[in-house]
């Protein structure tokens, strides 16, 4: 088991405490303000940074989760469950899983069945949703009036209005 301690390593700059030493007796207000800001920043640097630990587990040692469970939790049932889990995956286990069937198994896990495949082959004769007419200015899924109300040729003839030029007055 290894552990690394991470923290900030900053060199602290020493600044004289009194502004009279730095600026003399005739220090301006702006100089005093900047000095107090600098001293405030120096005080913040003096605070100790929080040290963090990163736990690394080697192949021979116990898993990090198991160690934390043993240290933090007094409940033995959780520790027993963690100990029952397999520690290491063997190459043999990878060879037993057929790669060719992985995609089909994933689709079955998402609810895909062979019936879906038959339905898809029948529906290829229909237009796909992205191949349908999409009038300009309408959002996805919106239906235009032309699509919702089919217009016959007779209606178009009766509604025809010729354009006439009107003289200006």
Curated annotation (Swiss-Prot):
Region (Disordered): 1-28
Gene behind the chain: SPP2
Binding partners and assembly: Associated with the spliceosome.
Described function: Involved in spliceosome maturation and the first step of pre-mRNA splicing.
Keyword Transferase: no
Entry similarity comment: Belongs to the SPP2 family.
Cellular component terms (Gene Ontology): spliceosomal complex
Keywords: mRNA processing, mRNA splicing, Nucleus, Spliceosome
The name this protein goes by in its record: Pre-mRNA-splicing factor SPP2
Signal sequence bounds: none
InterPro entries: Spp2-like, Spp2/MOS2_G-patch
UniProt-annotated location(s): Nucleus
GO annotation terms (biological process): mRNA splicing, via spliceosome
